[in-house]
Amino acid sequence: MAGVAACLGETSTAFARQPEPTPGKALNLMTFNLRYASSTGANRWPLRRPLVAQVLREQSPDIVGTQEGLYPQLKDIATDSPGLGWIGLGRDGGSRGEFMAVFYRKERLEPVEFDHFWLSDTPEVMGSTTWGNTNRRMVTWVTFEDRATGRRFQFWNTHFDHQVEEARRKAAALVSARIARVPQGVPVVLAGDFNALSGKSRSYEWLTGEGGLKDTWHAAARRSEEDADSFNDFRDLGRNGQRIDWILFRGSARVASAGVVTTRVNGQWPSDHCPVTARLEWE
């Protein structure tokens, strides 16, 4: 299903033969739960919008997997960051509901194909829920061609349920099975808000066990804000090293760094989640 995109292409499961990558071309990756836009309250979107723009400007990501963004909110981000294109579909269909929008740096990356599916027993049914969760959950994935290297890879973006553990476990199994269908020569990044602690949850164990994915956090040569929690809840930042936002990957890669972005201005957070970043180079 084609969503809102800066570049509309035909969705297919065909993959071209992968050219060899060019060394020295690392990608800056980010996962960022935006917190849906609200027009009232101390954390309303008009107050947070310039901080989101600041984070994106300072971190200069090549790809950002966002969660919870609403259509007008995503358009604001695109306006504030003109170097970024984006692809997404509302989880309720069209522009309705929260998006798993993928932003990408247009001068660096070319989207080749993209699609969406829902985290349920009927993943092709738009807005479907079958695992006891009341919120609809989905995945948006994009195949990119790196203009700097000619290499193609996939970026998957998701948001697991915040209430039902069984829904998270089944989501991990479904996502793992879908990624396994991607030809082995194609590297894959899976990013998102998983609503579960890294290293201490069944969904993490499944994705990094049977799913065969690696965590950029543990693969990184260095880490910044290592003890920071990725969920701040618009309060003082916890320092327990609890990450519910992850960037996982499949393929041979060198991860130079990973970190939690703790930007806060005059007590105002950009979101109730801190962005998590990784700098990765395919080998």
Where are these regions (language model features)?
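Solvent-exposed loop/turn segments at secondary-structure junctions
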Residues: 34-37, 69-73, 91-95, 108-109, ...
